[in-house]
């Protein structure tokens, strides 16, 4: 079975990716990463930084998760991300996404040993 850590990497990591060259990025990636099986995943964020940099966030600023759990961490620095949101006209199995790019601080939930990201919680403006 796929571990939570591996699922996080499949759903959220694309270190080499630079979607700027293609408005089709989300449509291709959501299929390639198996997020359109059974339904169109409504929202997904890809992070274009190294796995080491994203894993390091687990040792950065401890913040509350959206669900109230305490194992979320916010990156000190901005990271390059792409948000993919399903379009309102999208009908499974023809999932269609619109893409927006940003450089924001990311918030991830971490667990396990080694302590690694298992859930992408949010992206926010870095706190000052």
UniProtKB/Swiss-Prot annotation:
Tissue: Pancreas.
Assigned keywords, A-Z: Disulfide bond, Endonuclease, Glycoprotein, Hydrolase, Lyase, Nuclease, Secreted
SMART domains per the UniProt record, alphabetical: RNAse_Pc
Annotated stretches, region: Disordered: 1-21
Enzyme Commission code(s) on record: 4.6.1.18
Catalytic activity entry: an [RNA] containing cytidine + H2O = an [RNA]-3'-cytidine-3'-phosphate + a 5'-hydroxy-ribonucleotide-3'-[RNA]; an [RNA] containing uridine + H2O = an [RNA]-3'-uridine-3'-phosphate + a 5'-hydroxy-ribonucleotide-3'-[RNA]
Catalytic residues (positions): 12 (proton acceptor), 119 (proton donor)
Primary site of residence: secreted
EC class: lyase
Annotated binding of substrate, by residue: 7, 10, 41-45, 66, 85
Any GO MF annotation of the entry: ribonuclease A activity
Entries under PANTHER family matching the protein: RIBONUCLEASE, RIBONUCLEASE PANCREATIC
Family named by the database record: Belongs to the pancreatic ribonuclease family.
Protein name: Ribonuclease pancreatic B
